[in-house]
C-alpha cells in the first residue's frame, strides 16, 4: 500500500495539449505530468484514489529537457515524466468542473 503523502506527490498536474484533448475524446485517456521517479503502479493507484475512477492501463515516458541559450550562456531544462492513463469504460475525469 502506498502512503497518502506519496500519492499526493506522484501526480503533479494534468498535461493539456491538442494531442491530449484528442486522446481524451477518442480513447478515454487522460495525460498527467508525474514525478520523475513515479512508477506505473503508483500512478495507477494515485489516479484511482484521488479521482475515484477505475484505471485500465498506464503508459509512461520521460521527456528530455531541451538545451536553451540566454545570450552567451547555455543551460538545460529539467527532464520530466508524462503518464497516459486509460480509464475504464464509462469513467470520466472533469478538470474544468463546470455546472451540470
Swiss-Prot record:
It holds the Pfam family Ribosomal_L23. One of its GO terms (cellular component) is ribosome. One of its GO terms (biological process) is translation. SUPFAM superfamilies: Ribosomal proteins S24e, L23 and L15e (SSF54189). Transmembrane segments: none annotated. GO terms for molecular function: rRNA binding; structural constituent of ribosome. PROSITE patterns: RIBOSOMAL_L23. Keywords: Ribonucleoprotein, Ribosomal protein, RNA-binding, rRNA-binding. NCBIfam families: PRK05738.1-1, PRK05738.1-3, PRK05738.2-4. Part of the 50S ribosomal subunit. Contacts protein L29, and trigger factor when it is bound to the ribosome. HAMAP family: Ribosomal_uL23_B. One of the early assembly proteins it binds 23S rRNA. One of the proteins that surrounds the polypeptide exit tunnel on the outside of the ribosome. Forms the main docking site for trigger factor binding to the ribosome. Belongs to the universal ribosomal protein uL23 family. This is Large ribosomal subunit protein uL23. It comes from Shewanella piezotolerans (strain WP3 / JCM 13877).
Amino acid at each position: 500500500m502506498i502512503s497518502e503523502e506519496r500519492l499526493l506527490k506522484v501526480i503533479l498536474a494534468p498535461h493539456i495539449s491538442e494531442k491530449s484533448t484528442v486522446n481524451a475524446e477518442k480513447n478515454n485517456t487522460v495525460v498527467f505530468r508525474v514525478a520523475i521517479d513515479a512508477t506505473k503502479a503508483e500512478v495507477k493507484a494515485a489516479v484511482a484514489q484521488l479521482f475515484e475512477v477505475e484505471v485500465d492501463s498506464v503508459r509512461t515516458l520521460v521527456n528530455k529537457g531541451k538545451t536553451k541559450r540566454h545570450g552567451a550562456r547555455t543551460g538545460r531544462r529539467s527532464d520530466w515524466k508524462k503518464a497516459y492513463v486509460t480509464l475504464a469504460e464509462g469513467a470520466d475525469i472533469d478538470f474544468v468542473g463546470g455546472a451540470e
